[in-house]
Regions:
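Residue-level signature for tetratricopeptide repeat
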Residues: 19, 56, 93, 127, ...
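Solenoid-like repeat scaffolds
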Residues: 1-7, 34-44, 71-80, 94, ...
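Alpha-helical solenoid repeat scaffolds, predominantly canonical TPR units
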Residues: 32, 69, 103, 140-141, ...
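"A position-specific structural signal for the A-helix of alpha-solenoid helical repeats
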Residues: 8-18, 45, 51-52, 84, ...
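Structural motif corresponding to the intra-repeat A-B loop/turn of tetratricopeptide repeats
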Residues: 23, 60, 97, 131, ...
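TPR/TPR-like (Sel1-like) alpha-helical repeat modules
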Residues: 64-82, 91, 172-209
């Protein structure tokens, strides 16, 4: 049965892709995901797999390919959360030569996105950081923190991003240490990077005191 065969192929490839993704092996995961998508047919999960392809391409700097997959997600008219994240992906993978702040602003004004303002401001900050506009990036990250509400991962991610900028760009160790401390206080202890960030904050604070 060809249909069953295609379903089995898709499941095999997508399961392998998931395992590689868990190991942070983005290239391997992407190859398997793209192959798996050829066999998936009209599955309700197709939009989600397109979205993951978009994310992986964006993380590897393949913005043109990322945009293709984000558009595929939006074409399928998914539920709100998936559409929101695909729209953000489209904007964050936009060419740095283009001014995306107007489009981000439209997303901020959309009442449907009221609970996701922290995420939007974080994407705006990431875009400014890619342009090396670090002061603007810090400003948007602070807006992200102020608007994150109970979304601890977003809030912690923005604290960490500010800390990284102060440490790596401005070499302001005291400010970096303060923001790493805020990251640790905010970040859920079951997050995979909690121990690594705790050690980084501890080492930096010891360096400042020495």
């Amino acid at each position: 049965n060809r249909k069953l065969n295609n379903t089995s192929k898709a499941e095999y490839l997508l399961t392998r892709a998931y395992l590689h993704q868990k190991l942070n092996e983005s290239n391997e995961a992407l190859i398997l995901l793209e192959e798996g998508l050829k066999y998936i047919g009209k599955s309700p999960n197709k939009a989600r797999y397109n979205f993951v392809c978009g994310q992986l391409h964006e993380s590897l700097g393949n913005n043109l390919a990322a945009r293709k997959y984000y558009r595929n997600v939006l074409k399928s008219k998914p539920e709100y959360e998936m559409a929101f994240n695909a729209q953000l992906g489209l904007l964050s993978s936009e060419s740095l030569a283009n001014n995306t702040n107007i489009l981000f602003g439209e997303m901020l004004e959309d009442r449907k996105n009221l609970d996701n303002k922290g995420t939007i401001y974080q994407k705006m900050a990431q875009t400014e950081a890619r342009k090396k506009n670090y002061k603007e990036a810090i400003s948007f990250y602070n807006q992200s923190i102020a608007n994150a509400g109970d979304n601890a991962p977003i809030k912690a991610g923005s604290y960490q991003a500010i800390a990284d900028i102060y440490l790596d760009v401005f070499q302001d160790y005291e400010k970096a240490g303060s923001y790493y401390d805020s990251t640790i206080v905010t970040l859920p202890k079951n997050e995979s990077n909690f121990d690594k960030l705790s050690l980084k904050a501890l080492n930096l604070n010891e360096f400042i005191r020495s």
